[in-house]
Amino acid sequence: MSGKKYFIYKVCATLIVMLFTRASLYAQATSLIEDDGRKVVASVADSLSPLYAQPIEFADTATIEMQPTDSVQKKLRFGKRLINFFFKANTPDPNKRVDFGFLPGPHYSSTQGLGLGIMATATYSMDRSDPTLPRSNASLFSDMTTKGFLLIGLKGNNFFPKERFRLDYRAYIYTFPTNFWGIGYANGNNDDNETNYRRNRVDLMGRFLFRMARNTYIGPMLNFRYIKALEVSPGNMLTLFNGQDLTVHSQTAGLSFIYDSRDFMLNAYRGWFVQLDQTFTPRFLGNDYCFSTTDLTVSTYRKVWKGGVLAGELHGGFNYGNPAWCLMSEVGGNSRMRGYFEGRYRDKNIIEAQVELRQRIKKRHGAVVWVGAAEVFPRFDAMRWKRILPNAGLGYRWEFKQRINVRLDCGWSKNGPGFMFNINEAF
């Protein structure tokens, strides 16, 4: 072997030894031992290179106690905090006023491309001295992809002391390229109708509820929506959009009734949830498309065995009058009929149902399986059995915070599968 090659091999071997030495230091420095009830960093053997450690105390026996340098300690503290954040996030801390956490979520789809979503959640109590007061919650979510999808939103539920009042709110803004098939089941079922366009939307909703009896609330609600369709071909404006405006804004007011006996609203194990919204979008509020809407949701939850919960939901949305193309009832989304392209099937009315079995597998891991069905229709006499849309799927659950799950769902639709990554249970 030539002297040059021998020198190169010697340098490489030296570097490898140094790397393993540093890795060994990190492994030993992070182990903790109990000393008089205090956790201290374990001593590092004095045979390790002083490049990564410094002497801090000399004993009478001439032994040297070593400790990682400040830079190493900072890295260890950061790594420990990061590990604790993910592995102890579901451990409740009664001393925290707000239990907060966030989680990034990379994802990919053929329609949206490669994306990065960031989800954050917080739970808190308006009266910490009252253990019976449900914890309020707020969720912040954002997403962006390589194909031009951009979203940011906030939603939550706030319970005031003694449950006298309840505030539900939702706000989001997004822009993304999407598809449109037209209005009605027949148009949505025709693959040739698929047309591309860009959709911008702003949605603000709030309801302020007064407690009338145990678990029972009633109060006013307001909803502002702004939708704009861009990059639409002139021919599709007439055939698929029925000649309606591509820019729609609506100011809606109404009354909301809620009965909610769920033990925890973000991931219920037992109880009932009934919500009835009667809203009006009249001309005197500045609306070009005038209509009224009755929206009913009934959900129930029941423990069936250890770690198993059976959940069911029935939802109906009924529009009367002249709703715009973008304000009609739609099939699909993150909560119902998962796997369907949101809005492919749309009409004035919808009835949909789903049943889901949720099973905790081990520690923070769980799985779900569900079946569902839906139908959109212009009038009740136009309903047909053959137009019922089937749905089924399964999903993985990871408990990010206590009883707050990150979910990855795969749903099958009449037109193929779809994947969803989100936080909190679907319903």
Task: Describe the function of each predicted region.
Residues M1-L76:
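Cleavable N-terminal export/targeting peptides
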Residues T91-G101, H107-H249, D347, N405, ...:
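Gram-negative/organellar outer-membrane beta-barrel architecture
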Residues F100-F102, S136-L140, F165-A171, Y217-P220, ...:
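Transmembrane beta-strands of outer-membrane beta-barrel proteins
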Residues P104-P106, I118-A122, L154-N158, L204-F210, ...:
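Residues on the lipid-exposed face of transmembrane beta-strands in outer-membrane beta-barrel proteins
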Residues G113-G117, F149-G153, R201-M205, V248-G254, ...:
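Transmembrane beta-barrel architecture of outer membranes
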Residues A253-I258, R262-I361:
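C-terminal outer-membrane beta-barrel translocator/porin domains of Gram-negative envelope proteins
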